[in-house]
Amino acid sequence: MYKILIADDHPLFREAIHNVIADGFPGSEVMETADLDSALGLTQEHDDLDLILLDLNMPGMHGLNGLMNLRNEAPTIPVVIVSAEQDKQVVLQAITYGAVGFITKSSPRAQMTEAIEQILNGNVYLPSDVIRTQKSSPRRSGHEEHGISPELLQALTRKQLLVLERMTKGESNKQIAYNLDIAETTVKAHVSAILRKLKVHNRVQAILSAGDIDFAAYLRR
């Protein structure tokens, strides 16, 4: 079904993720490695990989430098960070450096399965509990730091705000459609309008920009 590489230096965690994939995506081919050099080698041998699940702290990684090296060597293979790290800035930097998702190792099994499914379907997955936390620096609010002014937010309709709020929770278009009781095509239209009105280029930028927004305040208008 899928071809997935797990790159993590902890055997027990590799086994746990392997089991998540085996149960959630039967028939998938799973490869494992415990260091960055081996991961880079496998991407050269298997350029048809559907996904790489990458630990930030395994040998050779040097934090996000390893992610950048992997993206440079295998730019067509989606990479998801799987880490015990829960610092919001690390999550944001990982996405900036080319990861298509970030899964915390403390995530429940069902949440990991859902995250992998979203990513394999072409969506981006971000841990909503981390993204919604306030930054440690009090200098600016999230929407100011990422360029979303109150004026831009006020241009969104109520329904678009509801869709954006769901996006920041890591929901796919299908989930948003179900939760808001609207058609998936309508959700896609709202997402396109949101990107245009917020002057961002993609879904990831919209999610990151909206991470600290108090949606309740805007929805009370």
From Swiss-Prot:
Q: Which residues carry this modification: 4-aspartylphosphate?
A: D55
Say yes or no: keyword Protease present: no
Q: Which InterPro entries match?
A: CheY-like_superfamily (IPR011006), RcsB_transcriptional_reg (IPR051015), Sig_transdc_resp-reg_C-effctor (IPR016032), Sig_transdc_resp-reg_receiver (IPR001789), Tscrpt_reg_LuxR_C (IPR000792)
Query: What does the record list as GO biological process?
Result: glycerol metabolic process; phosphorelay signal transduction system; regulation of DNA-templated transcription
Q: What phylogenetic lineage does the species belong to?
A: Bacteria, Pseudomonadati, Pseudomonadota, Gammaproteobacteria, Pseudomonadales
The residues the entry assigns to the signal sequence are: none
Organism for this UniProt entry: Pseudomonas aeruginosa (strain ATCC 15692 / DSM 22644 / CIP 104116 / JCM 14847 / LMG 12228 / 1C / PRS 101 / PAO1)
UniProt keyword list: Activator, DNA-binding, Glycerol metabolism, Phosphoprotein, Transcription, Transcription regulation, Two-component regulatory system
- Please indicate which superkingdom the organism of origin belongs to: Bacteria
> Domain Response regulatory: where?
3-120
The protein's name in its UniProt record: Glycerol metabolism activator
Query: Could you tell me which SUPFAM superfamilies the record lists for this protein?
Result: C-terminal effector domain of the bipartite response regulators, CheY-like
Question: Which residues form the DNA-binding region?
Answer: 173-192
Q: Which residues are in the HTH luxR-type domain? A: 149-214
Q: Which GO terms describe its molecular function?
A: DNA binding
Function noted in UniProt = Positive activator for glycerol metabolism.
**What Pfam families does the record point to?**
GerE, Response_reg
**CDD domains associated with the record:** LuxR_C_like, REC_NarL-like
